[in-house]
Swiss-Prot record:
GO terms for cellular component: cytoplasm. Transfers and isomerizes the ribose moiety from AdoMet to the 7-aminomethyl group of 7-deazaguanine (preQ1-tRNA) to give epoxyqueuosine (oQ-tRNA). Keywords: Cytoplasm, Queuosine biosynthesis, S-adenosyl-L-methionine, Transferase. GO terms for molecular function: S-adenosylmethionine:tRNA ribosyltransferase-isomerase activity. This is S-adenosylmethionine:tRNA ribosyltransferase-isomerase. Gene3D superfamilies: QueA-like. Pathway: tRNA modification; tRNA-queuosine biosynthesis. Monomer. InterPro entries: QueA, QueA_dom1, QueA_dom2, QueA_sf. HAMAP family: QueA (MF_00113). GO terms for biological process: queuosine biosynthetic process; tRNA wobble guanine modification. Belongs to the QueA family. Its EC number is 2.4.99.17.
Length: 345
Protein backbone atom coordinates (compact mmCIF):
# COMPACT_ATOMS: atom_id res chain seq x y z
CA UNK A 1 0.00 0.00 0.00
CA UNK A 2 1.22 3.45 -0.92
CA UNK A 3 0.77 6.46 1.35
CA UNK A 4 -0.91 8.34 -1.51
CA UNK A 5 -3.75 5.80 -1.44
CA UNK A 6 -4.96 7.64 1.68
CA UNK A 7 -4.62 11.20 0.41
CA UNK A 8 -7.38 13.74 -0.21
CA UNK A 9 -7.58 17.50 -0.76
CA UNK A 10 -8.81 19.33 2.32
CA UNK A 11 -9.58 23.06 2.12
CA UNK A 12 -7.78 24.77 5.00
CA UNK A 13 -10.92 26.66 6.04
CA UNK A 14 -12.52 23.34 7.09
CA UNK A 15 -9.92 22.82 9.84
CA UNK A 16 -11.82 23.78 13.01
CA UNK A 17 -9.85 26.30 15.08
CA UNK A 18 -12.23 26.52 18.03
CA UNK A 19 -14.69 24.12 19.67
CA UNK A 20 -18.43 24.58 19.20
CA UNK A 21 -20.29 26.27 22.05
CA UNK A 22 -22.24 23.05 22.75
CA UNK A 23 -20.21 19.84 22.53
CA UNK A 24 -22.96 17.47 21.36
CA UNK A 25 -24.28 19.78 18.62
CA UNK A 26 -21.39 18.99 16.31
CA UNK A 27 -22.39 17.17 13.15
CA UNK A 28 -22.25 13.39 12.85
CA UNK A 29 -21.80 11.55 9.57
CA UNK A 30 -23.12 7.98 9.79
CA UNK A 31 -21.19 5.42 7.70
CA UNK A 32 -22.83 2.07 7.02
CA UNK A 33 -20.16 -0.30 5.61
CA UNK A 34 -22.77 -2.95 4.72
CA UNK A 35 -24.82 -0.72 2.42
CA UNK A 36 -22.16 1.96 1.77
CA UNK A 37 -24.78 4.58 2.60
CA UNK A 38 -24.14 7.87 4.40
CA UNK A 39 -26.45 9.86 6.69
CA UNK A 40 -25.99 13.44 7.92
CA UNK A 41 -26.98 13.77 11.59
CA UNK A 42 -25.88 15.56 14.77
CA UNK A 43 -23.74 14.06 17.50
CA UNK A 44 -26.61 13.84 19.98
CA UNK A 45 -28.22 11.39 17.52
CA UNK A 46 -25.50 8.85 18.38
CA UNK A 47 -27.90 7.49 20.99
CA UNK A 48 -30.00 6.09 18.10
CA UNK A 49 -27.02 3.93 17.07
CA UNK A 50 -26.76 2.31 20.52
CA UNK A 51 -28.98 -0.45 21.91
CA UNK A 52 -29.66 -1.69 25.43
CA UNK A 53 -26.95 -4.22 26.27
CA UNK A 54 -24.27 -2.55 24.15
CA UNK A 55 -21.09 -1.15 25.68
CA UNK A 56 -19.78 2.34 24.92
CA UNK A 57 -16.04 2.43 25.64
CA UNK A 58 -14.51 5.79 26.62
CA UNK A 59 -10.87 6.76 27.10
CA UNK A 60 -10.65 8.56 30.45
CA UNK A 61 -7.15 9.99 29.97
CA UNK A 62 -6.59 13.61 30.91
CA UNK A 63 -4.35 15.99 28.97
CA UNK A 64 -1.47 17.42 30.95
CA UNK A 65 -0.70 21.14 30.55
CA UNK A 66 2.60 19.81 29.27
CA UNK A 67 4.16 22.88 27.64
CA UNK A 68 6.47 24.75 30.02
CA UNK A 69 8.32 28.05 29.51
CA UNK A 70 11.44 28.59 31.58
CA UNK A 71 14.84 30.20 31.73
CA UNK A 72 18.31 28.70 31.68
CA UNK A 73 19.69 29.06 35.19
CA UNK A 74 23.08 30.09 33.82
CA UNK A 75 22.16 32.73 31.24
CA UNK A 76 18.46 33.54 31.62
CA UNK A 77 17.83 32.45 28.01
CA UNK A 78 14.30 31.26 27.19
CA UNK A 79 13.65 27.50 26.98
CA UNK A 80 10.41 25.77 26.03
CA UNK A 81 9.95 22.23 27.34
CA UNK A 82 7.26 19.81 26.15
CA UNK A 83 6.66 16.80 28.40
CA UNK A 84 6.25 13.56 26.43
CA UNK A 85 6.58 10.58 28.75
CA UNK A 86 6.77 10.03 32.51
CA UNK A 87 9.84 7.84 33.10
CA UNK A 88 9.30 7.62 36.89
CA UNK A 89 11.38 9.03 39.74
CA UNK A 90 10.69 12.64 38.62
CA UNK A 91 12.26 12.00 35.21
CA UNK A 92 10.48 12.85 31.97
CA UNK A 93 11.23 12.45 28.30
CA UNK A 94 10.84 15.91 26.77
CA UNK A 95 11.30 17.98 23.64
CA UNK A 96 13.24 21.20 24.23
CA UNK A 97 13.47 24.41 22.19
CA UNK A 98 16.14 25.48 21.43
CA UNK A 99 17.47 21.94 21.90
CA UNK A 100 21.12 22.75 21.16
CA UNK A 101 21.32 24.75 24.40
CA UNK A 102 20.11 21.80 26.47
CA UNK A 103 23.25 19.80 27.20
CA UNK A 104 23.63 17.27 30.03
CA UNK A 105 23.79 19.14 33.33
CA UNK A 106 21.93 22.22 32.03
CA UNK A 107 19.37 23.54 34.55
CA UNK A 108 16.13 25.31 33.64
CA UNK A 109 14.04 27.31 36.11
CA UNK A 110 10.26 27.69 35.69
CA UNK A 111 7.92 30.31 37.14
CA UNK A 112 9.05 31.64 40.48
CA UNK A 113 11.60 28.87 40.92
CA UNK A 114 9.13 26.36 42.36
CA UNK A 115 10.05 24.01 39.53
CA UNK A 116 13.49 23.24 38.13
CA UNK A 117 14.67 20.71 35.54
CA UNK A 118 18.15 19.31 34.96
CA UNK A 119 19.09 17.54 31.71
CA UNK A 120 20.33 14.03 32.52
CA UNK A 121 20.40 12.48 29.02
CA UNK A 122 20.37 13.53 25.36
CA UNK A 123 18.39 11.08 23.19
CA UNK A 124 19.20 9.99 19.63
CA UNK A 125 16.10 11.61 18.12
CA UNK A 126 16.90 14.95 19.78
CA UNK A 127 14.72 14.62 22.87
CA UNK A 128 15.98 15.20 26.40
CA UNK A 129 15.49 13.25 29.61
CA UNK A 130 15.18 15.79 32.42
CA UNK A 131 14.88 15.35 36.17
CA UNK A 132 12.51 17.74 37.93
CA UNK A 133 13.11 19.27 41.35
CA UNK A 134 10.24 20.87 43.24
CA UNK A 135 8.48 21.34 46.56
CA UNK A 136 4.86 20.21 46.75
CA UNK A 137 2.77 18.14 44.32
CA UNK A 138 4.12 17.95 40.78
CA UNK A 139 0.75 17.88 38.99
CA UNK A 140 -0.49 20.91 40.93
CA UNK A 141 2.65 22.84 39.99
CA UNK A 142 2.21 21.77 36.36
CA UNK A 143 -1.44 22.93 36.39
CA UNK A 144 -0.33 26.39 37.53
CA UNK A 145 2.73 26.80 35.26
CA UNK A 146 2.00 24.69 32.16
CA UNK A 147 0.05 25.36 28.97
CA UNK A 148 -2.13 22.96 27.02
CA UNK A 149 -0.14 21.58 24.03
CA UNK A 150 -2.67 22.13 21.23
CA UNK A 151 -2.15 20.33 17.90
CA UNK A 152 0.09 22.10 15.34
CA UNK A 153 -2.84 22.83 12.99
CA UNK A 154 -4.71 24.88 15.63
CA UNK A 155 -3.48 28.47 15.52
CA UNK A 156 -6.00 30.20 17.79
CA UNK A 157 -5.56 30.54 21.54
CA UNK A 158 -7.93 28.31 23.53
CA UNK A 159 -10.07 30.46 25.83
CA UNK A 160 -11.12 27.63 28.15
CA UNK A 161 -8.53 24.88 28.68
CA UNK A 162 -11.25 22.44 29.80
CA UNK A 163 -12.65 22.43 26.25
CA UNK A 164 -9.59 20.37 25.25
CA UNK A 165 -10.55 17.80 27.90
CA UNK A 166 -13.38 15.29 27.73
CA UNK A 167 -16.02 15.62 30.46
CA UNK A 168 -14.92 12.20 31.78
CA UNK A 169 -11.15 12.90 31.80
CA UNK A 170 -9.53 11.79 35.06
CA UNK A 171 -6.26 9.86 34.50
CA UNK A 172 -3.43 12.39 33.97
CA UNK A 173 -0.91 11.54 31.29
CA UNK A 174 -1.79 12.61 27.73
CA UNK A 175 -0.01 15.07 25.46
CA UNK A 176 -3.17 15.36 23.33
CA UNK A 177 -6.89 14.83 23.88
CA UNK A 178 -8.76 11.71 22.73
CA UNK A 179 -10.81 14.03 20.55
CA UNK A 180 -13.64 11.62 19.68
CA UNK A 181 -14.71 11.98 23.31
CA UNK A 182 -14.95 15.78 23.21
CA UNK A 183 -18.50 15.60 21.80
CA UNK A 184 -20.05 13.85 24.81
CA UNK A 185 -21.82 15.87 27.50
CA UNK A 186 -22.84 14.61 30.97
CA UNK A 187 -26.48 14.85 29.84
CA UNK A 188 -25.91 12.77 26.70
CA UNK A 189 -23.97 10.13 28.64
CA UNK A 190 -26.79 9.98 31.19
CA UNK A 191 -29.36 9.41 28.42
CA UNK A 192 -27.16 6.70 26.90
CA UNK A 193 -26.84 4.95 30.27
CA UNK A 194 -30.60 5.27 30.88
CA UNK A 195 -31.16 3.43 27.60
CA UNK A 196 -29.37 0.40 29.07
CA UNK A 197 -25.98 0.92 27.45
CA UNK A 198 -23.01 0.05 29.66
CA UNK A 199 -20.47 2.88 29.78
CA UNK A 200 -17.02 1.36 30.23
CA UNK A 201 -13.80 3.30 30.72
CA UNK A 202 -10.23 2.46 29.79
CA UNK A 203 -7.06 4.54 29.68
CA UNK A 204 -4.66 5.23 26.84
CA UNK A 205 -2.30 8.17 27.26
CA UNK A 206 -2.10 9.88 23.88
CA UNK A 207 1.43 10.77 22.79
CA UNK A 208 2.53 13.53 20.42
CA UNK A 209 3.36 10.80 17.92
CA UNK A 210 -0.34 10.93 17.06
CA UNK A 211 0.48 14.10 15.03
CA UNK A 212 3.66 12.75 13.46
CA UNK A 213 3.21 12.37 9.68
CA UNK A 214 3.96 9.10 7.94
CA UNK A 215 7.37 9.65 6.32
CA UNK A 216 7.59 6.55 4.10
CA UNK A 217 5.87 5.85 0.77
CA UNK A 218 5.28 2.18 1.58
CA UNK A 219 2.77 2.12 4.44
CA UNK A 220 4.03 -1.30 5.60
CA UNK A 221 7.38 0.26 6.50
CA UNK A 222 5.88 2.80 8.92
CA UNK A 223 6.74 2.35 12.60
CA UNK A 224 4.02 3.45 15.01
CA UNK A 225 4.80 5.38 18.20
CA UNK A 226 4.07 3.55 21.45
CA UNK A 227 1.52 4.66 24.04
CA UNK A 228 0.65 3.43 27.53
CA UNK A 229 -2.75 1.75 28.05
CA UNK A 230 -4.68 0.16 30.89
CA UNK A 231 -7.90 -1.89 31.10
CA UNK A 232 -9.07 -2.84 34.59
CA UNK A 233 -10.45 -6.23 35.60
CA UNK A 234 -13.89 -4.71 36.22
CA UNK A 235 -13.97 -3.12 32.76
CA UNK A 236 -12.72 -6.31 31.09
CA UNK A 237 -15.44 -8.36 32.81
CA UNK A 238 -18.13 -5.93 31.65
CA UNK A 239 -16.90 -6.12 28.06
CA UNK A 240 -16.70 -9.93 28.11
CA UNK A 241 -20.32 -10.04 29.31
CA UNK A 242 -21.42 -7.73 26.49
CA UNK A 243 -19.63 -9.89 23.90
CA UNK A 244 -21.08 -13.08 25.36
CA UNK A 245 -24.61 -11.66 25.15
CA UNK A 246 -24.18 -10.86 21.45
CA UNK A 247 -24.32 -7.08 21.85
CA UNK A 248 -22.01 -4.48 20.34
CA UNK A 249 -18.78 -3.08 21.73
CA UNK A 250 -18.76 0.52 20.50
CA UNK A 251 -15.45 2.34 20.90
CA UNK A 252 -15.21 6.10 21.24
CA UNK A 253 -12.18 7.08 19.21
CA UNK A 254 -9.07 5.54 17.75
CA UNK A 255 -7.36 5.43 21.16
CA UNK A 256 -10.08 3.19 22.60
CA UNK A 257 -9.94 1.10 19.42
CA UNK A 258 -6.16 0.66 19.63
CA UNK A 259 -6.38 -0.37 23.30
CA UNK A 260 -9.15 -2.92 22.74
CA UNK A 261 -7.57 -4.37 19.61
CA UNK A 262 -4.15 -4.58 21.30
CA UNK A 263 -5.71 -6.64 24.08
CA UNK A 264 -7.77 -8.73 21.64
CA UNK A 265 -4.65 -9.48 19.59
CA UNK A 266 -2.67 -10.39 22.70
CA UNK A 267 -5.30 -12.75 24.12
CA UNK A 268 -6.60 -14.43 20.92
CA UNK A 269 -9.77 -12.35 20.75
CA UNK A 270 -10.48 -12.56 24.48
CA UNK A 271 -10.79 -9.42 26.60
CA UNK A 272 -8.55 -9.53 29.66
CA UNK A 273 -7.43 -6.90 32.15
CA UNK A 274 -4.08 -5.64 30.94
CA UNK A 275 -1.70 -2.69 30.91
CA UNK A 276 1.46 -1.90 28.98
CA UNK A 277 2.68 -0.10 25.87
CA UNK A 278 1.11 -0.52 22.46
CA UNK A 279 2.43 0.35 19.00
CA UNK A 280 -0.35 -1.46 17.14
CA UNK A 281 -0.77 -0.27 13.54
CA UNK A 282 -4.28 -0.96 12.22
CA UNK A 283 -4.43 -0.67 8.44
CA UNK A 284 -6.39 -2.34 5.61
CA UNK A 285 -6.02 -6.10 5.86
CA UNK A 286 -6.19 -6.08 9.67
CA UNK A 287 -8.46 -8.74 11.22
CA UNK A 288 -10.67 -7.11 13.86
CA UNK A 289 -10.90 -8.86 17.23
CA UNK A 290 -13.06 -6.79 19.60
CA UNK A 291 -14.57 -3.57 18.24
CA UNK A 292 -17.97 -3.74 16.50
CA UNK A 293 -18.59 -0.03 15.79
CA UNK A 294 -17.07 3.32 16.71
CA UNK A 295 -17.20 7.09 16.58
CA UNK A 296 -14.19 9.14 15.55
CA UNK A 297 -13.37 12.60 14.21
CA UNK A 298 -12.24 13.49 10.69
CA UNK A 299 -8.49 12.94 10.40
CA UNK A 300 -5.53 14.30 8.44
CA UNK A 301 -4.84 13.15 4.87
CA UNK A 302 -2.30 10.31 4.66
CA UNK A 303 -2.52 9.70 8.43
CA UNK A 304 -2.50 6.34 10.20
CA UNK A 305 -5.91 7.27 11.64
CA UNK A 306 -7.48 7.44 8.17
CA UNK A 307 -5.89 4.03 7.53
CA UNK A 308 -7.48 2.67 10.71
CA UNK A 309 -10.96 3.78 9.63
CA UNK A 310 -10.31 2.36 6.14
CA UNK A 311 -9.27 -0.96 7.71
CA UNK A 312 -12.78 -1.23 9.15
CA UNK A 313 -15.05 0.31 6.53
CA UNK A 314 -13.02 -0.04 3.32
CA UNK A 315 -10.71 2.53 1.74
CA UNK A 316 -12.91 3.58 -1.18
CA UNK A 317 -16.02 4.00 0.99
CA UNK A 318 -14.10 5.98 3.61
CA UNK A 319 -12.58 8.32 1.01
CA UNK A 320 -16.05 8.78 -0.51
CA UNK A 321 -17.34 9.66 2.98
CA UNK A 322 -14.52 12.17 3.43
CA UNK A 323 -15.34 13.78 0.08
CA UNK A 324 -18.99 14.00 1.15
CA UNK A 325 -17.90 15.66 4.41
CA UNK A 326 -15.77 18.17 2.49
CA UNK A 327 -18.61 18.94 0.05
CA UNK A 328 -21.03 19.42 2.97
CA UNK A 329 -18.54 21.66 4.84
CA UNK A 330 -18.05 19.42 7.86
CA UNK A 331 -15.45 20.71 10.33
CA UNK A 332 -12.22 18.68 10.50
CA UNK A 333 -9.68 17.48 13.08
CA UNK A 334 -9.55 17.90 16.87
CA UNK A 335 -12.29 20.53 17.35
CA UNK A 336 -14.25 19.35 14.32
CA UNK A 337 -17.25 17.13 13.63
CA UNK A 338 -17.51 13.36 13.98
CA UNK A 339 -18.43 10.19 12.16
CA UNK A 340 -20.06 7.03 13.45
CA UNK A 341 -19.13 3.80 11.70
CA UNK A 342 -21.77 1.08 12.00
CA UNK A 343 -20.93 -2.65 12.27
CA UNK A 344 -19.67 -4.19 9.04
CA UNK A 345 -21.30 -7.58 9.70
Amino acid sequence: MNINDFDFDLPEELIAQTPLEKRSESRLLILDPKTEELEDRHFYNIIDELEAGDALVLNNTRVLPARLHGERAETGGHIELLLLKDMGQNRWETLAKPARKMKVGEEVVFGDGRLKAVVVEVLDHGGRIVEFKYDGIFLEILESLGEMPLPPYIHEQLQDQERYQTVFAKENGSAAAPTAGLHYTPELLEKIADKGVKIVELTLHVGLGTFRPVSVDNVDEHQMHSEFYRLTEEAAAQLRAVKASGHKIVASGTTSIRTLETIGSKFDGDIQADSGWTDIFIKPGYEWKVVDAFNTNFHLPKSTLVMLVAAFAGRDFVLDAYQHAIDEKYRFFSFGDAMFVRPKK
